[in-house]
Structures are given as C-alpha cells and as structure tokens.
Amino acid sequence: MAMAPVSQVPQPRRPHKWYQHLYVQVLIAMALSILLGYFAPDVAKSFGPLGDAFIKLVKMIIAPVIFLTVVTGIAGMRDMKTVGRVIGKAMIYFLCFSTLALVVGLVVVNIVQPGASMHADPAKLSSSLVQTYVQRAHDTSLIGFLLNIIPATPVSALASGDILQVLFFSVLFGIALASVGEAGTPLLKVLESLSASIFRLVAILMRAAPLGAFGAMAYTVGTFGIRSILNLAMLVGTFYITAILFVLIVLGSVARYNGFSILKLIRYIKEELLLVLGTSSSEPALPGLMAKMEAAGCEKTVVGLVIPTGYSFNLDGTNIYMTIAALFIAQALNIPLSWGDQALLLAVAMLSSKGAAGVTGAGFVTLAATLSVIPSIPVAGIGLIFGVDRFMSECRALTNLIGNAVAAIVVARWEGKLDKNQLTAALNGEFGPVEAGEDLAGHVTTS
C-alpha cells in the first residue's frame, strides 16, 4: 500500500515547550471546558458550534483521504503476478484479524456497556437530521444498501462524500491504474503528490483540535452534566484494557504459535513505539519498522508489501476502537441496536477502516465515515466522544503498529521467507539497533 515518501515522514525536531504539545493543549482545553460546563452550563452550551465546526472539517477530508490512500496503494503494486501470492496471504491474515479485532470490541462493549448510564438526548445533538434516523432505519434494505455502494458517477461519490461509494470506485480505479503499467506512472506521481498535500491538510486541521475539544466537551458537560465525564472515562478505560488484552492474548497467541514472543517483539520495536506514542501516529515509524523487520529475518520483498499494505488494511487498534466507540454512542443516546444492526456495523466498519491512514485523527475520521452509513446512529453523536478521542489515538496507533509487525513475521514464515535464527537473534538483542532508512527508500515511496 502506498505510504508517504521518505520526505513526508516527519523528521526529528527541536524539543517543544510543554505547552506546545497538542496533547497538552487538548488536555488543558478539556479541563477548562469541564469547569465551564460544571459552573456555567448555559454558557458552556454556547460553545457547541466549535465542536460542530471541527467535526465538519474532519468530514470534509474523509473522501479525498480514502480515495488517495486506496488508489495510490493499489496502483503502487506494479507487478501484480509477482506480488499476488504474498498480497493474497497478507489479505487473508488482515481480514481474519481485522474481523477478530472488531468482534472483540463488539463483545467487550456489550458486556461493559460504558455509555449505558449517560442518557444523552439525541434531540440535543443540534441536528435536524436526528429525526430522520428512525425512518432511515426502516427504509434501508440489504439490497438497497448494496446497490447504493455503486455510485452514479465517480464525481458524485466524491462530491456527496458517500464513503462506501468512494471506496468502491477507489479500488476499481487503483486496479485499472496498476494494470496500465508505465503509462500510469505520471498520474500515480500526481496522486502521490496530492496525497502528501491532503495529509498536510489533515495535520493543519488537527491544530484546531484543542478548540474543537473545548467546544465539544463544554457542550457535553453543559448539556448532559458532569456525570457524562465518568462515562467518557469508562469509555477510554474500556478501550485501553481491550487493546492491551488483544495484544497480549490474541497477538501473543499468534506469536507463540509462530515461534516468537510478543513481549520480546515489543521490546525489539520499542523505539518505533515511543515515536508512535509521541506523535499519536504510526506513519512516522514506518521506515524504522521496515528496517527492523528486515533485520529480524523477514525477506525484503515481504516486508515491502506487507507492512505498507497493513497500514491501511491491518488496523487492529482502529477496529477495536470503532466498534467500542460506535456502540458507546448508541448506548449513550439510548438507541437499542439489534444483533443485525451490530452485524451491519461490523461489516461497514470492516470496509470503511480500509481507508484509514496512519495519521493523527484518522481513527476519528474513520468512525465518522462508518456512522455516516449506519442508519440507526446519528453521525452527530461523535461529538459526545470527540473530547476524549485524542487520548485514545495513541493506543490505536500503538496497537496498529504491533499488529503490523506481527503480520510481517507471520506472512514471511507462511511464505518460507523467514530466517528463524536471525529472528531469534534479533528479538534476543544479539546485535545492535537498526537505523531507519537503510535501503528503504524504494519501499516507502512505491509500495
């Protein structure tokens, strides 16, 4: 899957002062908004448009992000026959464990029910569309849902922002662009340049996150009371515990079956994990992760295909988050979801998560994309969790990164392209650290 060129990967910068970190700014904004919502609820509710505006900004970039990520990724795989077997096996792995992550999140949130006592009023989500969701739930049929995935025109899909239509066209266009070979190279380069610009736009929009968090949290506390914060804290805790258990138990079992320790792997890629923790994004860690997987005995071809592709197709942390967050919103709004509704949510999340990028805020973008095609849950409901979403992004990115490291080793072993002795030596720390960028430029720019 095409990822950001080396030049796009953020380079080390001089240390920021503590108050310049986005994480700190969001934390301060949340603290102030909670105080305002508690002591002056009427005033706090007036700041709701700040959160609404930020959500609209996020929704604005959903379609281009998915289109460019999917098209450049598929088109970048030039020799389809050579890479087909590796990609096929990788996709089987991605499908199985992405589905498992979604199911795990679904099961946990049904058991814990972190939003059940919030009792938020859907009518107070400041959206006149809320009243249409019940009717849409009755009007939507399976056949109609499937037919609606096919857009009338490519332009209409992008203009309307229908995520499944955008994804459908993106996959077809990516395959077509890859099939024309060198004739498609100029267009691919243009799309990669445009992708860099869109990712930069995402970064720019994320600078407004403190204002959006302030507005969303102030409105939430002012409207629903301080008890809502307890529910949000429970949401964050539920997600973190679920992600940790998924890594240790599910991925740990996979690692043990394939002859290595998940804890040793985590220690081996600790520098990349710290980079992810500092940026809330798995993208900056891509070159280092690829270098380390090669050094750990995975063949370069497998690494160059599996890891970049996994950045869009193997997002375990994002998938866990999506089902937990979506059902939290439904529980908070007292919207009962049947098992059929939850199965639809799982299916849509499986598709929409394939357009998620490894950048800060992408999980929230993907959640908005998912809810936009689920008739029972108001998209405006994401405003309930926006204030704490920033504090779940690190866990999403960390889980995604670990999942892709495991995937590279498993697929390499599956293909017979893994040096087991080298893997053991690497995980036991028997040679020095590997630096990012060692013969990786070609992979990062064209995979």
From Swiss-Prot:
GO cellular component labels: plasma membrane
InterPro entries recorded: C4_dicarb_transport, Na-dicarboxylate_symporter, Na-dicarboxylate_symporter_CS, Na:dicarbo_symporter_sf
GO MF, any single term: malate:proton symporter activity
TM ranges: 21-41, 57-77, 92-112, 141-161, 163-183, 201-221, 232-252, 320-340, 345-365, 368-388
Protein name stated in the entry: C4-dicarboxylate transport protein
Highest taxon of the lineage: Bacteria
GO biological process entries: L-aspartate transmembrane transport
Keyword Zinc-finger appears in the UniProt entry: no
NCBIfam families tied to this protein: PRK01663.1
Protein location: Cell inner membrane
UniProt record similarity statement: Belongs to the dicarboxylate/amino acid:cation symporter (DAACS) (TC 2.A.23) family.
